[in-house]
Structures are given as structure tokens and as C-alpha cells.
Amino acid sequence: MRNIGDGKKTIIRSAAKRDDANEISSEKDENTTNKLTKREFGAKTFAFTSLSLFASSSSSQKEEAFADDSLNSNFWEKVDLPLEPGVILLDIAFTDENARHGFLLGTRQTILETFDGGKTWDAKDLGQDVIDDEVNYRFNSVSFNGDEGWIVGKPAILLHTVDAGKTWERVGLSPRLPGIPVLITATGDNGVAEMVTDQGAIYLTTDAARNWKAAVEETVDATLNRTVSSGVQGASYYTGSFSTVSRNPETGEYIGLSSRGNFYMSWAPGQAYWQPHNRSSARRIQSMGWRKDGGVWQLTRGGGIYLSDTKALPEEDDEFTEGKIGSRGYGLLDLGSNASGTKYFTVGGSGSVFSSEDKGKTWKRDRGTDEVAGNLYKVAFAKDDVGFILGNDGILLRYRGSA
């Protein structure tokens, strides 16, 4: 097995043996070891650990899923999925501009495929030559650029396809990779992609994962512990990880939220290190990310929502305005918008869904989703009329537009 000897900027793939990986027992607390496969790449400062694509875990998942009209919502319909109880859905992406063919990821080795815009779903079986059925993978992120796509997950695994997901190849990663891959983005054609871990490692490839370049020089905890006088509350002697990572598709900037929610960090292309920031509210941040207009949103514990005043990453911590939302104290977990950015949605605990048509200034609760018995974690739109809400216990809501 070959690893890079002294370069922290390049990662070379090589053959690697597989290590045993412990089963993931829950959404948040998963004690696993990394697992290696065909190709491995490493860097002096950062190195990727092996990642593998999730395959269907049982033959019982052959039943077709379909959309139903059980919800009394103006915007959303529930999609029944061929999944066992307890699966948490984590990401979704489509391969074509019309958003007809796509993949849905989750915990417990869940990968589903659709050919009709998400109305029906079937389990995708990748085969034992790609993944090990005995390892309970949590697939965190999927991204496509045309027919080329990527998947990452935990235990550390990376999957690559060049034929719109008909076949997948497992890419080996070094066990020295700091953290677990949580976000993958197909940023261009012909093997161009970016991968981020929960420890803040950012890697770039331009040749379909044959070589990788480290974009930052150290992990976020190393940066924070080196700059203990940064003035950011909770940053000194930090040993945690990012709970969420969000990428600005226009600028390539990243936002990473600390696991405790007491501060966040940002990175822009060309910077050697992540930059720490104080939170804008006394309440800890639950989640945050980028708006379509380039601004930033924050969701705080207790159901608060804040939007940056500028269409960019705020330079000062007080450049946020609180949105008017009657969340009744339910935690809000994600915010997203349709593809054009004209309609916003935020989701959270106990089936909570709110919509805004004035870019987040005021919000209206969708009482039709109150009967959804679960937490909603993610809002994702491929087009203005193709959108989804992902939740726990196999909950998938499909956008059907205003009634």
C-alpha cells in the first residue's frame, strides 16, 4: 500500500485492505472504525479514510414506494418508501436537468432510486463487490454533475459513478483521514469534486479521485487551539466536530457549525485555515447554511430564525435580522428554498413545516403536516416544482405546489 510520503497537497490512491467496521446504532452516536477498499489516498496533514456506497440491506426492500394523499397540506404529499422503521433519510440528488432520475440516501445502508421525479422509489442494490452487507453504513451525501456522481458516508466510504448510477465503484481512502466525510459536491465535469469531513478537512480532485489536493492545512480543532485568543466564545481548546457543513454553490465558500452550536466557522477558496465566528444570538445555533441570494441563515434552539442582512457571509456577528415565526418552541432543523429562491421552507420537530414568500421575513405554518409523526431534517429542491423534505423513520414529503 502506498501513501504520499511528504506532500500535504496531494493524495495518491493505492490498494488497501479492509478493516472491520462496527455497526452504527443510532443517528447521532455511531461508534465505528474506518474501512478500506480498492483505492487509497493520503496527505501529510489530512488523509481520506475509505468510503463505500450504500447498498440495499435486505431483499425485503424490493417493494415499490409511491406518493399518497394522506396529508391535508397545500404544498406536500407523503411518499411511502420500501424501508424498515427507524431509517433516517439524509440526502437526495438527481442526475438529469428534468429531475426525473435520482437517488435518496439514509442510515442503515439505505439507497433508493427513482425514475419518475420521486413519486415512486425502489431499493438500489450495489452488490457485495462494492459494499459489505455486514457493515451498517450511514450515507451522508450524494451529488451529481450530469452522469457523474459521488456518495460519501460513515464508516468512511466514497462511491463514484460515471453512468448516472447504473454502476458504482468504491474509492479507497486512507485510515489517516481526519473525521468522517459528511459532504461531497460534484463541482465540474470529468472527475472534478470536493469532499469535506466533520473535522474540517477539505479535499479537491480533478481526475475522478486518482489524486486529491488538501485545501486547508489543518483541522478545525488544531486551528482553534492554536488561536486561543480569537475571541470566539467556546472556541478555545475545542475538541468537537462540525454538526453541519454547507457549501455556497456560487462562490465555493463553506460554513461549518460547531457540534455544540456555540460558534461557527467559514472557509473561502484560497484560505489556508477555517475562520471562527461568534453566533448572532444568545441561543445556540441548531443549523445554518446559505441562501439562494448568497446570504446566510441561522436556526437557533427553541425555534428562532435569523437571516444575514447582506447577500454574503456577514463580517460582523450582529449583521443578522430575526424572522417572524411562531414555532411554538419546536426546534427548527433546516431551511431551504425552491430553485429560484422565491419560496422558503423551514422544517423541524414533530412534523413542523413553515413557508415564507417574502424571503424569510414572515412565515406561515403548514398545519397539514402536523399529523406527520416524526422529525424533519432536510429541505431539498432540484427545480421550482420538484422538492422534498427528508425526515426520520423513513419520512419523505414530496412538493406538489400550492393547492
Locations of regions flagged by a protein language model:
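Short hydrophobic alpha-helical membrane-entry/anchor segments
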Residues: 54-58
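Residue-level hotspots at or immediately adjacent to binding/recognition sites across diverse folds
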Residues: 36-50, 61-403
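N-terminal secretory signal peptides
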Residues: 1-36
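Intrinsic disorder/low-complexity segments
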Residues: 11, 22-23, 49, 53, ...
